[in-house]
């Protein structure tokens, strides 16, 4: 919260019981280590931690009060305490209440791949005209989403909120907090398919929960080239973005410039935009087209939209280019992976004009019964792309090595692969590093930088 709230207001918002009143709270923190004077401390509970153990510390450091699902033995004087059944759920209710104080364009983004990229692109565009709040990094779960909403200030004129999920009901739950005026789905793929009936129809159903909280008069923005999203017939204004002729926001004249990015033309009902996208990958056209669609819908000028797309910057380990001595380049895309995203980035690597192209690939998780086949399919794709070297790491990557041919190595762990990585990362090599987040391939990037 950046607008001061009383303990009684907070208690009413979360449906809690005010055990003891105190001063006004000005901010929310879930980490006792970064408490500022006047904070509301929300002690979260996880498998290996319980924030209730740090309530006294947080209050003594200056927090105005706290939520608590466990009754404290002693109530410190001058501090407010609000009893709730579940602190995480209460945090979500507080965020939903606080969001209601802001009558601004609220963009909610979900999809199987490209959520963070699209969120960053939309924020880059909208920031050319509005003071825009965006989700930091990919804090897109039941804790990150309310924390983002609680960062809203009076000065904000728009917000772009990224929401992820791996089970049914999660997008719906976050949607009750966000209550979007614009709902965006980037695509439907196999990410977390093992938890979603094992089918892409299940993934579509889960992602479509975003529309349940779309506000009256709201806008849906979809990937118009996605076969499953193309089946949706929604009862509100919808803009489809892509290369297909039936798209409302159509991309043409695509010119890929390797790792330096690409250019394209985006045409809407009102205008035509010549765009320069400063990040590699053909998939970037969808984020750019969605930026055009939403920017135009919200009244941005043509110049603001073009400038915003050009201002896009990748975040974290997402298509981050690292230039190393000896004309070596690392394409750091190791934050996460699913079959569609891995295939796209491998095609990008294959099109790179470098003497040597190398891929370091790790397991893709949450694929359920499709896991083995998905890794085998990546191996078959590698045969088409004819890269000079592939290093596969992890249990599931064994299936890739059963179908891939050529200069292909397999290791069970990152540590086992280090010697080969150093040897193969020769001058003039462009290397792609990609795996699911749990593989911790940031270690690979560090090793390659040492080389």
Place the predicted regions along the sequence by residue.
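N-terminal leader/targeting and accessory segments in enzymes
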Residues: 1-93, 350-354, 380-394, 398, ...
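Residue-level signal for inorganic ion chemistry
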Residues: 10, 39, 58, 94, ...
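Phosphate-binding loop of NTP-binding sites
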Residues: 12, 90-224, 228-237, 423, ...
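Short gly/ser/thr-rich secondary-structure transition/capping motifs
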Residues: 19-28, 89-92, 140-143, 163-168, ...
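Active-site beta-alpha connecting loops in nucleotide-dependent enzymes
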Residues: 46-49, 314-317, 334-406, 410, ...
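Acidic, Mg2+-coordinating active-site environments of NTP-dependent enzymes
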Residues: 72-77, 184-329, 354-355, 380-384, ...
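ATP-dependent carboxylate/acyl-activation modules
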Residues: 109, 316-320, 438-446
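Short amphipathic alpha-helix with an adjacent loop that forms part of the alpha/beta core around
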Residues: 418-424
């Amino acid at each position: 919260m950046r607008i001061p709230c009383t303990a009684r207001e907070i208690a009413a918002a979360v449906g809690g019981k005010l055990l003891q009143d105190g001063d006004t709270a000005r901010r929310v923190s879930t980490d006792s280590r970064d408490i500022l004077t006047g904070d509301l401390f929300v002690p979260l509970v996880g498998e290996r931690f319980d924030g209730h153990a740090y309530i006294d510390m947080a209050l003594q450091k200056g927090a105005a009060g706290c939520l608590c699902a466990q009754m404290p033995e002693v109530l410190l004087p001058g501090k407010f305490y609000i009893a709730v059944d579940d602190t995480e759920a209460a945090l979500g209710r507080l965020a939903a209440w606080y969001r209601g104080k802001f009558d601004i364009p609220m963009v909610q983004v979900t999809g199987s791949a490209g959520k963070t990229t699209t969120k960053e692109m939309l924020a880059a565009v909208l920031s050319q005209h509005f003071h825009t709040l965006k989700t930091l990094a990919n804090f897109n779960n039941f804790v990150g989403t309310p924390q983002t909403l609680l960062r809203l200030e009076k000065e904000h004129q728009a917000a772009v909120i990224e929401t992820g999920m791996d089970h049914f009901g999660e997008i719906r739950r976050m949607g009750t907090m966000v209550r979007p005026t614009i709902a965006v789905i980037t695509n439907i793929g196999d990410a977390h398919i093992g938890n979603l009936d094992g089918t892409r129809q299940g993934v579509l159903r889960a992602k479509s929960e975003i529309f349940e909280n779309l506000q009256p008069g709201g806008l849906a923005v979809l990937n118009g080239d996605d076969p499953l999203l193309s089946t949706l017939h929604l009862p509100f204004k919808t803009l489809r973005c892509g290369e297909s002729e039936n798209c409302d926001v159509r991309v043409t004249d695509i010119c890929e410039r390797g790792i330096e990015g690409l250019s394209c033309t985006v045409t809407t009902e009102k205008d035509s935009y010549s765009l320069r996208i400063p990040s590699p990958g053909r998939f970037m056209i969808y984020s750019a087209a969605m930026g055009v669609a939403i920017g135009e819908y919200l009244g941005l000028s043509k110049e603001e939209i073009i400038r915003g797309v050009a201002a896009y910057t990748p975040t974290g380990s997402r298509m981050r280019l690292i230039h190393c001595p000896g004309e070596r380049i690392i394409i750091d895309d190791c934050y996460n992976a699913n079959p569609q995203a891995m295939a796209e980035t491998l095609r990008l690597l294959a099109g790179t004009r470098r003497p040597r192209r190398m891929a370091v690939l790790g397991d893709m998780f949450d694929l359920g019964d499709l896991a083995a086949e998905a890794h085998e399919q990546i191996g078959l794709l590698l045969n088409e792309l004819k890269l000079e070297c592939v290093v596969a790491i992890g249990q599931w990557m064994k299936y890739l090595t059963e179908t891939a041919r050529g200069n292909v190595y397999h290791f069970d762990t990152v540590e086992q692969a280090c010697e080969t990585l150093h040897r193969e990362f020769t001058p003039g090599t462009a290397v792609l590093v990609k795996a699911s987040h749990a593989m911790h391939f940031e270690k690979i990037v560090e090793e390659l930088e040492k080389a």
